[in-house]
UniProtKB/Swiss-Prot annotation:
This is UPF0227 protein Shewana3_2292. HAMAP family: UPF0227 (MF_01047). Belongs to the UPF0227 family. Pfam families: UPF0227. It comes from the Bacteria. It comes from Shewanella sp. (strain ANA-3). InterPro entries: AB_hydrolase_fold, UPF0227, UPF0227/Esterase_YqiA.
Amino acid sequence: MIFYLHGFDATSPGNHEKMRQLQFIDPDVRLISYSTLHPKHDMQHLLKEVAKQMQYCADPAPLMVGVGLGAYWAERIGFLNGLKSVLINPNLHPEETMQGKIDRPEEYADIANKCVSEFRLKNTHRAMCILSRVDEVLDSEATAEALKPYYTIEWDETQAHKFPQLAAHLPKIKAFKLS
């Protein structure tokens, strides 16, 4: 089973396409949707939805996959549920990058302060990160520097921030899920 968390643009047709591509790894891909506008509510909602879906999961190793803002949540929700996660162009600091896009971006900083201390250290090797060298939204080099002590970093030379084509990375994602 794969839980897919969309980015800030929840209605993008690219989300359906990425879910379709992920079905080459596991036919059971489930969209876990959230508002993107209310971080504290989103966190509670995502925790509840993943817990509900896990009740009906026979897969011994479900995987969280998120893109952009969805990767921010995949890392945290995956950690809190003991799941591996794949972070595609993760938005590590939405309290900064979401200014002017949502009502209360400062809630992300509050969530970070209330999160388990040093959660990445406790989550070492439980996530892999795929970064685009040509991400037009986020600084991929800074993201790599922040995450490389904890997670494997895979680079893509051609995809933009929304990462429409996962095909080149599907074998690595599958191997990570099964490892």
